[in-house]
């Protein structure tokens, strides 16, 4: 603003010279009224030349407005002035008695405070106070705390604070008073682009959407930095709403409502708060607003006809699989549905449940259904949002392990006891996703194997039983999302004193062996994409440079940075990194320090658990051993592999009187990393070996009568496994998931005339899982399609006793090829087609070979499918007739998807 000869002093209201930019207006009472109205809410002034603008006498109105007790609210950013000087602003704001700036420079800016008014709405702060005061009757005799968060400027950055801001709570609840005091000590980043440690108020302020949760205790530390204080004050439910000036999209602050009660539904509180704000000429995101007509699309006959089909199909599936809940989702624009998370920008991407086309057999799940109906999702949020966005089927074994940011309904699902879920997109003939069906597996279905079997069966049912003339489920990939969380160890400087915090409660999730398959498949030349939800990190100490921090250490997930993830992954893997958090800060201070380049990660407890410790628990189940040692079963398996133990030795030996074909060989020892394990060290620990059934079938072998040749080790250092066709075969695929944990070993008693235990031979050594792969596996989660196997079976067919005797009995050399990998092994005379497939799967580390086709090279040099026993007999006959030295077999991905049989010609790929 120009000033011609400097202002004379601005008497009265501190008016400007007529030669200013407002000089076009005459010096009349109307002009003064105009200026009064212009400056009523305050404004920023800026000089455009080097002349000074002085106000030598304090304006009564300015003095009143700038006084600390006036209802004055300073906002973190001025929408009409982007380049004002923060330093100058901070210097001038405390001046309540004099407003003077000598020799103003070009571009200098300062604040003219709002004029005092006796009206009901002299400032936003006062209006907010009136708004929450209007809730007094609503929260009376209830455990509610209502507080306001507003933006402030500190050192050039914006932060949200509730210090000295309006608040309301019932004085009878001392815990709420304490939480109010705690909240005043927190500042949350409010600058655009901030993602880390912004807290609940910060997310609402930046995203301009309301957010609520039934229980803040389910938040991760980075999502809710006040988590520890909330636990102490018994705070549970929370609702936060953005506040806007009516007709403006600029967020002025956040209203937060907390309660000591778990709440699944906040519709009533949301509507009351919105009406209270509207009464003082403010607004929030409201589900009462009608969407813009340009986005609104009324249901067509197509959608109306599809809803009964979908509803009946969901009800049928729920009855067949005992599902507690099945939901149908559609874009809000298709339904003409309104919601609190809508805006003109995102309305086209918002999806919500179709309440008339859902199936809720479980009464306890109705609260979750209501929460879904109230809380809409944006495309990309949760497995439903991902299905709309990527046009894929998405399966998650545990929805409650998602962060609230990635799945806003994760907390509601946890309270409702829901776990595994599958999202299925329904496409129209145009190829667009019109609906998404969301199925929640039975609440008791927690075992990995059970989930896999149910998933396969459900996929078959979806393909075969869904009938619609306009909607289809085919040509879709399946992506399995595996959220993994692991405890971090923090070391913070609290009150200038270094204090190391010991490990807190660890939330462990067993690594799915699906991941192992994806890693192995990629090593063999297959193209695999890994989808990251949470990156798993080894426990390590992280330091904080912030003093007097209000944030106490609690379990948290701090993923690796992108370059670290890429380095940690298997070479050649294409890593698709999803949502992650970088180094975070709260209140301007660094919360966590990143790992130094080249710093070696701390080893886990595996290194402290030696072979001697493991041997003490060989007589029991792996689950019991893991519990006694103090690790999870998955970790114990990894420890065993490091010692060369591929299978847990223990099992109860029953049905020993089976034929020699079914019970052939037993391995006498295990070649560990620190030496051999002799069977006599734990052989007598199995009481079943001395049972009457044992002795009745043949002479028993005592530990001190073991033949000398049994002391020799096997070639590959692991126990020989029983024939997979044996009814007593039991493969421990999921630790702790079966009631027969004791039946997971591989010890068998051979039954022959001399009752002698023979050791197994293998021409090629089994590929051991190296430590680097283990580390990579521990921090990955996999993306897979229907082409990839869902069922795991690592049992291996039996091998003969020696190479010479095998050849003498007609053993055949086999060379198998899978991509760039090649293996050689011996086909035993006693083997059938099943044993051949099993050996190939074991050598290539394939979990389920039924997903692949076997082909052999015939006498015409053509590749012929090998699908059954008859094909194998034909292959062997050709081998003998042509007198070739080796049978050549090729392993390729199956041309058709096979889930519990086959989809037939469904087109799934």
Curated annotation (Swiss-Prot):
Composition bias, kind Polar residues: at what positions?
Answer: 55-70, 690-716
**Domain of life according to the entry:** Eukaryota
User: Which controlled-vocabulary keywords does the entry list?
Assistant: DNA-binding, Nucleus, Transcription, Transcription regulation
**What InterPro entries does the record tag this protein with?**
NLP, NLP1-9_GAF, PB1-like, PB1_dom, PB1_NLP, RWP-RK_dom
Query: Pfam families from the entry?
Result: GAF_NLP, PB1, RWP-RK
Here the segments flagged for biased composition (Low complexity) are: 725-745
Which compartments is it annotated to reside in? Nucleus
Give start and end of each RWP-RK domain. Answer: 595-676
Q: Which SMART domains does the protein's record reference?
A: PB1
**Predominant location category:** nucleus
Question: What GO molecular-function term can you cite, just one?
Answer: DNA binding
Every PB1 domain range: 811-894
Q: Which GO CC terms are listed, alphabetically?
A: nucleus
Give the region (Disordered) as residue ranges.
51-71, 536-556, 568-605, 690-745
The UniProt entry, under PANTHER family, shows: PROTEIN NLP1, PROTEIN NLP8
* Cited function: Probable transcription factor.
Q: What is this protein called?
A: Protein NLP1
Q: Which organism is this entry from?
A: Arabidopsis thaliana
